[in-house]
Amino acid sequence: MGRAAPHRRATETGAAGCVQVTGSWPLTESAWWASTTTGTTWMQEITPLIQSGGDLTSVLTQPNWDRVPWLEEHRAQVLNLEQRPSPRLFATHFHCDMMPQSFFKDKPKVIYIMRNPRDVFTSSYHYYGMASFLVNPQSQDNFLQKFLSGKVMFGSWFDHVKGWLNAKDQDRVMYISYEEMIWDLRDSVARIALFMDSSLTPKVVEKIADHCMFKNMKQNKMSNYSLVPSEFMDQTKSEFLRKGVVGDWKNQLTVAQAELFDAVYRDKMKDVKYKFVWN
């Protein structure tokens, strides 16, 4: 549950051109970032609720792209973000080395979500097919080649994950997987709250987890992108919040495609020591 917004300038390989615009943003040590290749829509729902102590007002009245703005999206330049009270919430798809200078200076905390790249591919394939502002994915074979070689928006999944896993000051980075959140959302919310130094009662944690269940978020027009005109996102082709499950790649990839994916994955990730839940 995390993809590019329609008002973002999308390219095939990434958004490096936006970095300079954001490079001078004033941040604070208490600013929060959800930096991910997937699951940002989820974090745009969860983190404001943790911050508000479970008050649903913001997530029911404010679109998620204004509630937790995208660093790489031009709308962030007109929201007067520096005037928001600290801690401020941001989301981004940037690679670690693409972050603005103020990020490395002020050292805000980072919540980094990872997901089985096979499911990331599956989700991306459907998303590219419904978003008019992205390059048409064409055949699944064609899109798979692009995905594995990093010729998609925001570049290589492999480089993105490895870059953030090697980030400095890892005590300020929380690594969590989409799978963990699917399997036990209440525990995930509690862990995220602890990382954000927010003291929540079990009742509030339960309330947040219930609201942020996929089936409930799918009904929230402030989070399901139904506010976006169909000329940009045609949700008759594929819903923005599509399935919210683990392992849908098994219904998408052919045997040959899965074998190719596995071979590339083994080669690209052979030196990574982090234990992924999907391995």
Segments predicted by a language model, with ranges:
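PAPS-dependent sulfotransferase catalytic domain
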Residues: 1-176, 222-279
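PAPS/PAP-binding and catalytic site of the sulfotransferase fold
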Residues: 41-53, 176-200, 208, 216
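Generic structural signal for individual residues within well-ordered alpha-helical segments
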Residues: 121, 144, 182, 189-190, ...
